[in-house]
Swiss-Prot record:
Keywords: Activator, Calmodulin-binding, Cytoplasm, Differentiation, DNA-binding, Nucleus, Sexual differentiation, Transcription, Transcription regulation. The keyword Transcription applies. InterPro entries: HMG_box_dom, HMG_box_dom_sf, SRY, SRY-related_HMG-box_TF-like. Interacts with CALM, EP300, HDAC3, KPNB1, ZNF208 isoform KRAB-O, PARP1, SLC9A3R2 and WT1. The interaction with EP300 modulates its DNA-binding activity. The interaction with KPNB1 is sensitive to dissociation by Ran in the GTP-bound form. Interaction with PARP1 impaired its DNA-binding activity. Pfam families: HMG_box. Coiled coil: none annotated. This is Sex-determining region Y protein. Gene3D superfamilies: High mobility group box domain (1.10.30.10). The keyword Flavoprotein does not apply. It is found in: Nucleus speckle; Cytoplasm; Nucleus. PROSITE patterns: HMG_BOX_2 (PS50118). The gene is SRY.
Amino acid sequence: MFGVLNSDDRRAAIQQPNILAFGRTSSDLWTSNPTSNYWCETRGNGRDSGQNRVRRPMNAFMVWSRDQRRKVALENPQMQNSEISKQLGYQWKMLTEAEKWPFFEEAQRLQAVHREKYPDYKYRPRRKALPQKSDKLLPAASSSLLCRQVLVDKWYPFTYRDSCSRATHSHMEDQLSSSQPVNIANSLLQQEHHYSSTSLRGSPETLATHLSADPPFYPK
């Protein structure tokens, strides 16, 4: 029994230095691989943080509006930033070239300093994020009803005022509700050709007048 305990103690003592050595090895790998450090620090997104990003040098309008924006914000604390920008843009356009010239000179000086400080700087505009398209589809019932309404409105835009055309319209709706999509398209094309060659030569009012003026026919 004592021999078993001694062997277990020796095995634990051997494993402990191995665990410590593995910890030192993993820490050495962490410090010697800057790519993995950068990936973990940036959470894998590969983008620079806002502190490391180099900003563009200010132009003349930005130099002028830097102080003017504070004044407008203090005078109108309820005004939104977009409204302040619109007002500043209007005021800048109203200035003369002589009034704008000192701000152009200051902007040129700032651009020269920026060029000396960041000689390899290149402006890279940020792309706007595209809105994500919804993958949700309409239910089968609503999509079939919408398709049915579109087909009826497309092929039969005129108003049904007489009893004959009302009956035809109700018959068409029954066909649309009971037929398959391919049969619907074929029947619509055939009936549209028939109506365009016969009943649509005149207006619906003229057609109703003709139907009421003709005497009824009684077979003998």
